[in-house]
Amino acid sequence: MRTILLTIAYDGTDYYGWQIQPDLPTVQGEIEKALHRVTGKEIHINGTGRTDRGVHAYGQCATFRIGDGIPTDRIAYALNNSLPGGIRIVSAEEKPEGFHARFDAKGKTYRYRLLLCGPHEDADGAPQAQRQLLYLRNYVYQVNRPLDLAAMRKAAAAMEGTHDFACFQAAGGEERETTVRTVYRVELTERCLEEGFFPEEESAHVLDIDVTGDGFLYNMVRIMAGTLVDVGSGRIGAADVPAVIESADREKAGHTAPPQGLYLMRVYFEEDFGHGEE
Amino acid sequence: MRTILLTIAYDGTDYYGWQIQPDLPTVQGEIEKALHRVTGKEIHINGTGRTDRGVHAYGQCATFRIGDGIPTDRIAYALNNSLPGGIRIVSAEEKPEGFHARFDAKGKTYRYRLLLCGPHEDADGAPQAQRQLLYLRNYVYQVNRPLDLAAMRKAAAAMEGTHDFACFQAAGGEERETTVRTVYRVELTERCLEEGFFPEEESAHVLDIDVTGDGFLYNMVRIMAGTLVDVGSGRIGAADVPAVIESADREKAGHTAPPQGLYLMRVYFEEDFGHGEE
């Protein structure tokens, strides 16, 4: 038996999240169906992160075991021919026996993407911002208030490090042994989209919040992003963020930013840290 | 009674075209439902063009009649609050009694959008182009062959003017009195997307084919776009396009480009030609 690691990109708009569910389209379900069409076998895959409905990925990972048959270097091509256009296998590689996309993951990077729009009105008083989001509505969290980026960067720095992140955990996830996690980096990058694909991108500003950590609690990145937006709009003081974390109280943190702004960018394994021993 | 002209933008991905159909989501159906929610009345709207399933619009038009009640300058705002995010009312304006979005239209501009990608393979031999189209797959026609733009521009010029365009008409549309139409302009604009919203836009080339005419036969723009792609890839000679039109034979023209690359950009009425007499 070979152990195969898939790297997967997907547009989460049309899926009820990663995890397989009866009678609902999910990313895991579509990939297992495609594996069945390609190999004729029922193959179960283990994903690194169970992304929620509407959340996207550029670098989700999953492992499965497979016997003889399709060569490893044809798996991505064969699956892509069988998968819907919104799910793409970026690569498939063989790993040592027992390698597991979830248990062997050492960390992940998520991106949370904001679209910063001023509150505009057209001649009729109708908010122009509504039109702006026609084509990007499923891929970004639109914020119509001015945001104080310096305050957000200060708050982001306070979120880095090893903390009990219970304040950034939503109810409803799996039970965890501990709510202590290490956030290696929270990086804010703003850029202006000069001439994009859609007219709505013209003169829009994108603010990406890239969060890298060793693990994440349920909805943690979305609550971090919502908290940063609340800091940027003055609802929460940047200087208060350490106390919010200290409190371990979900009520003291900011709102949960919506799923469509979230992208699972990359999963890190032992060898990504440069001291693998395969 | 007031006569109201709506200008409408929509993402056609989730709709079975413009025209209302029982039990299927359509753009006209969603707008009539929203009008009912906003006014409490059953109001029928007349659209300018019956776009097909998957076709988009930035400037579709539609008219309807309405009595007292909601002020004209609040209609767009009220409808947008009631419509799904993929349909946006750009404007609502009062027109003279009897004005009709379809019968008073003097012309339209459609855009057909191609994404030009070289045939790339990654290290595993899997076509990279498949990944590139994850997020733009519903908004563009991806072409992986090199295209001869000079030949396409020559063919485009041959499509301009007043001709019997029966060769560019698909079966299945409404019956028309004549297949003679005037195409005022076919313009090709290529541009490179430097740093777009999605990574797949990086270094992609967009080729827009903008077609303005007094009227269009069923699938005419999609067949014109497919014919131009066939000219660009050498399947049809640019010098043969006048004879293709002359033949009035659908079999001699090129393939029908897929719906997701097509956008209804603008509808022209009498006053847009500068000699209105309202």
Task: List the predicted regions and their residue ranges.
Chain A
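Structured-RNA-binding interfaces characteristic of tRNA pseudouridine synthases
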Residues: M1-E278
